[in-house]
Amino acid sequence: MIDRVLLELNKTEGIKGSMVVGKDGLVIASQLPGSVDAELVGAMASAAFGAAERTAAEIGMGTLEQTMIEGEHGKTLMVDAGEGILVVLTDAKVNLGLIRITMKRAAEKIKAMF
């Protein structure tokens, strides 16, 4: 079921792949390109999201909604998805508004599955 949500998400222009990883770093579902090591990305995304959550709490920002890593060749966006974290890999030049809305809708569907 989660895989269907990810496949639909991946149809969004600019999205190269997506996955859901547990807060413990274990991969729950993945629709990433074959060249990407899902287990490694999952573990690192979980650690990055956890650090961002702690930072947001420490500086009084409230609940973390999203974190983004931006590089020369693309972006990695992460949002809370209940028991997991929705991770999306994108091209460098994307419509971030569209990506964020699409991710939020997908995360809500995923939350309902846990």
UniProtKB/Swiss-Prot annotation:
Recorded GO terms, molecular function?
Answer: guanyl-nucleotide exchange factor activity; molecular adaptor activity
Q: What is this protein called?
A: Uncharacterized protein MJ1340
SUPFAM superfamilies, sorted: Roadblock/LC7 domain
Which GO biological process entries does UniProt record here?
Answer: cellular response to amino acid stimulus; positive regulation of TOR signaling
Describe the family membership recorded for this protein in Swiss-Prot or TrEMBL.
To M.jannaschii MJ0310 and MJ0714.
Q: Which Pfam families match?
A: Robl_LC7
Superkingdom of the source? Archaea
